[in-house]
Amino acid sequence: MFPVQRVSGRDVNLAFVGPPKSGKTYAMSELRFHRAQTVYIDITGEVVAPFVFGRGRDVALAIGLRPCVHTVWQCGHLMDNPDVMLAGVKAIGSAAQLYHERVTIIFDEVGAFKDQGHKKTIDHMCGVARTGRQKGVSVWAGSHRPQEMPPNLNAVLDETWYTGCGNAADYDFLRRYVGKEELVAAVKQVTRHRAATKRAGATEFPFVRRLHSGAAEFSRLPGDPEWTCSPDGNWCVVEQLGTGTLGRPHG
């Protein structure tokens, strides 16, 4: 199962990166139920939860009403109204920071926010992630491509989980700016594995887990292929729910 990770006074800030149908949204949706309080900022209208709201202030009021609350803010209708979107995000962030227990805010489709001019919203989420150690708030960000993740948001993340890449430009970005050829090879293997097993009806796929700190926390187990773990130990291939035979489970 997914680990419940702690860093100081919050869970880790995570990025989930992968093309459509790669298991990225599935991983984010499943992992949130291992946290007591989560808010999913959803512009697609496809994410479900026990509590779904259309206004940011209603989501903010729901935080902490019960010991375990998972809410979704369906805000796709606000993509053409950056000011109202920002106001909703601020209300949610403030409520999460005031709550006495840990809260995770899931900020999906970051590339769409970036492309449609929601710079202030992205900047505010960066601030929430940066001060999360003191306030007990963590942020998970999701994007389809690695180059879509804004530098200021990427700087406050603890880990990135790659569920695959969509094209050569994505791989070239990883090669040039992130993890060189070894990481590219691992993500390619994950992508190939997904394509092969998806035809067989699989719904869960492996991913590459990379630590931003560069700490050497991973090592290959006997019999593991070389591409399942980096030489310096700062990334490895893991199963999405800690099962199966590819790579090794985590937690």
Segments (PLM) and residue ranges:
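Conserved P-loop NTPase motor module
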Residues: M1-R10, L14, A27, A36, ...
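A short, well-structured beta->alpha microelement
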Residues: M1-V4, P50-V69, K90, S94
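Flexible, charged surface loops at secondary-structure boundaries
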Residues: V7-R10, R32-R35, I63-V69, A96-E101, ...
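Hydrophobic/aromatic beta-strand patches that form the interior of the parallel beta-sheet core
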Residues: L14-F16, Q37-I41, F53-G54, T71, ...
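Conserved P-loop NTPase motor cores
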Residues: L14-R32, D83-E181
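Walker A/P-loop NTP-binding active-site region of P-loop NTPases
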Residues: S22-V59
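Conserved P-loop NTPase mechanochemical-coupling segment
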Residues: I63-V84
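Accessory, usually C-terminal, subdomains that scaffold auxiliary metal cofactors
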Residues: A186-T197
